Amino acid sequence: MGVKGLNQLIKEHAPDAFKEYQLKNLFGRKVAIDASMCLYQYLIAVRQQDGQQLTSEDGETTSHLSGMFYRTIRLVESGLKPMYVFDGKPPVLKGGELEKRLLKRQDALKQIEDLKETGTVEELMKYEKRTVRASREQNDEAKKLLELMGIPYIVAPSEAEAQCAELARAGKVFAAASEDMDTLCYEPKYLLRHLTVAEARKMPIDQIDYEAMLKGLDMDRSTFVDLCILLGCDYCETIKGVGPVTAFKLIKEHGSLDNIVKWIQENPEKTKYKVPENWPYDEAKQLFMNPEITKGDEVDVKWNEPNVDGLVEFMVKQKGFSEERIRSGAEKLKKALKGGVQGRLDGFFTVVKSSPAKRKPDAKDAKGKGKKKAKR
């Protein structure tokens, strides 16, 4: 679900934290991608002309495999080095949110049955999107596909967003990539949004600089996490009637969520807000501040050459994809992975203070310097 209204608050109060990129601008960058979010997007977006999901001859959904295969190839062809992070076991505190989502899916399934006779395609699609979730089997299939493609992945101990942020913070990757704004609660160096859908929707990729965001909001990490909980997160409900503008104002006035709760409880005559009974906001904060993760320096990230025969066996013989297209995609991937070792230009140079002019290097010197390997 993410954090309600956070994106707009950052744009308003910390505009310098935002940068917009095209895919080509991220050439040479290593990125940790929230795999669960990707699978959800592909299950919704990758459809046949009649609006139905792609399926094999046996009727098994294959939209997630199509999206993961072709989108990953596109990322690698653009010079990125993607790795994926899958969700592990969800925190106990998230159970309430997951139960709400289940009820919404059940309600949507009922609406779909009612609309099958009289509803339009658009109406059916609206409710069908609410029923989408990646199953355990689909997650396992995506992992198998990535392994055959030579693309690294790991399974997080718990939340994938927290693990992506840790990898970015540890320098294993440049940024965490997810649509969930609560990734920022886990302190990534950078967050990339719309990375896996930007080209299809003709929209830019948003980069949020974590430190610039805190500076613009004039908050430390603890206060920022308090703000996110007050806005509404996956771990607990929020205070009814408190929207983004009010949440920001309350945090600025009182300094912390503890102080806000205390003020509301001690001054019921001065405010219309009521703190939810047994509100586990402090437990939610601890999950953000001290998430269950694998330390970045314990994670080995390596890209390998794709297993073409394995891809044909899995994607063509088992899942019914076109052999010509799978082989073509595998060759593109192989070529792009070999070409990706060039690195970024900013990995070759260090910015230094200006000094007295020196002679220009001749062509031979320039050629020699051009062969210097990037650090990363």
Swiss-Prot record:
Subunit structure comment from the entry: Interacts with PCNA. Three molecules of FEN1 bind to one PCNA trimer with each molecule binding to one PCNA monomer. PCNA stimulates the nuclease activity without altering cleavage specificity.
Binding site for DNA: 47, 71, 159, 232, 234
Gene Ontology CC annotations of this record: mitochondrion; nucleolus; nucleoplasm
Bias kind Basic and acidic residues: ranges: 359-368
Region (Interaction with PCNA): 341-349
Family in the record: Belongs to the XPG/RAD2 endonuclease family. FEN1 subfamily.
EC number: 3.1.-.-
Cited HAMAP family: Fen
GO molecular function, one term: 5'-3' exonuclease activity
Cofactor annotation: Mg(2+)
Location within or outside the cell: Nucleus, Nucleolus; Nucleus, Nucleoplasm; Mitochondrion
Annotated cofactor note: Binds 2 magnesium ions per subunit. They probably participate in the reaction catalyzed by the enzyme. May bind an additional third magnesium ion after substrate binding.
Name of the molecule in the record: Flap endonuclease 1
Posttranslational modification: Phosphorylated. Phosphorylation upon DNA damage induces relocalization to the nuclear plasma.
Enzyme class: hydrolase
Function in brief: Structure-specific nuclease with 5'-flap endonuclease and 5'-3' exonuclease activities involved in DNA replication and repair. During DNA replication, cleaves the 5'-overhanging flap structure that is generated by displacement synthesis when DNA polymerase encounters the 5'-end of a downstream Okazaki fragment. It enters the flap from the 5'-end and then tracks to cleave the flap base, leaving a nick for ligation. Also involved in the long patch base excision repair (LP-BER) pathway, by cleaving within the apurinic/apyrimidinic (AP) site-terminated flap.
UniProt region (N-domain), positions on chain: 1-105
Positions that bind Mg(2+) 1: 34, 87, 159, 161
Region annotated I-domain, chain positions: 123-254
Example GO BP: base-excision repair
Binding site for Mg(2+) 2: 180, 182, 234
Top-rank lineage group of the source organism: Eukaryota
